[in-house]
A protein has these predicted regions:
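Short beta-strand segments
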Residues: 1-2, 10-13, 40, 65, ...
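Conserved N-terminal subdomain of the carbohydrate kinase-like
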Residues: 1-35, 53
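Conserved functional loop/turn residues at catalytic and ligand-binding sites
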Residues: 2, 35, 42, 79, ...
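Structural motif
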Residues: 6-9, 35-36, 61-62, 81-82, ...
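Residues that scaffold the ATP/ADP-binding catalytic core of kinase and kinase-like folds
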Residues: 10, 93-95, 184
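Conserved beta-alpha-beta core of the PfkB/ribokinase-like small-molecule kinase fold
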Residues: 24, 36-106, 127-128
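Conserved phosphate-binding/catalytic region of the ribokinase-like
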Residues: 70-76, 101-189, 193
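N-terminal low-complexity segments that are often proline-rich with Ser/Thr-Pro
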Residues: 194-198
Length: 198
């Protein structure tokens, strides 16, 4: 962590890289239409693609946090309900450098053109841009003095999926996720639900 509470992440995949199609099949036995599957890219891409395809076929909403940043096969996007890249990941997915607000909007449109209905591009202290069913809008970040940025994105994605699973619309869930992510910045740990509510 640097003097501005920004972190650098090093991934030692270990057991994550052993997750395979049989593991996915076991997990999907427990899921049903309307459930939410949240994934990232610290498991084999082949497993991500398989899980997305199978879950989509079952009516499960698949949310992909494309971290760590890498290019992805275009066919994956049509099996996703939503993709939630940060600025760097969004640039990697599209090849478009984000220099201003108009670029963020353009990148969100580009990602949707790949086949996914919903995109949330997280922008740190600038909040996030949501593109939902062809309409874009922004959610401001809650202003805090960061202590540790570790897991802010994970917290955002987890809270977002909790909100959606509890029946919130995407905007409501994103506001809750933004609040949770902001709270995660002011402690050296992720926020608990009671802390989020208070």
């Amino acid at each position: 962590m640097d003097d501005h509470a920004e972190n650098s992440i090093v991934v030692a995949s270990g057991a994550n890289m052993l997750l395979n199609e049989q593991d996915v099949d076991k997990m999907l036995e427990e899921m049903c239409e309307g459930d939410i599957l949240l994934m990232q890219l610290e498991i084999p891409l082949q497993t991500v693609e398989y899980a997305a395809r199978k879950a989509f076929g079952k009516g499960v909403k698949v949310v992909l946090n494309p971290a760590p940043a890498r290019s992805l096969p275009k066919e994956l996007f049509r099996h996703l309900y939503m993709v939630t890249p940060n600025r760097i990941e969004a640039e990697m997915l599209t090849g478009i450098k984000i220099a201003n607000d108009a670029d963020v909007e353009k990148v969100a449109e580009e990602i949707c053109a790949m086949g996914v209905k919903n995109v949330i591009i997280t922008l740190g202290s600038k909040g996030c841009l949501i593109r939902e069913e062809g309409v874009s809008y922004r959610i401001d970040a809650f202003k805090v003095e960061p202590v540790d940025t570790t897991a802010a994105g994970d917290t955002f994605n987890g809270a977002l999926c909790v909100g959606l699973s509890e029946g919130m619309d995407l905007k409501q869930a994103a506001v809750m996720a933004s609040k949770a992510s902001s709270l995660s910045l002011i402690h050296i740990s992720e926020p608990t639900r009671p802390r989020l509510i208070s």
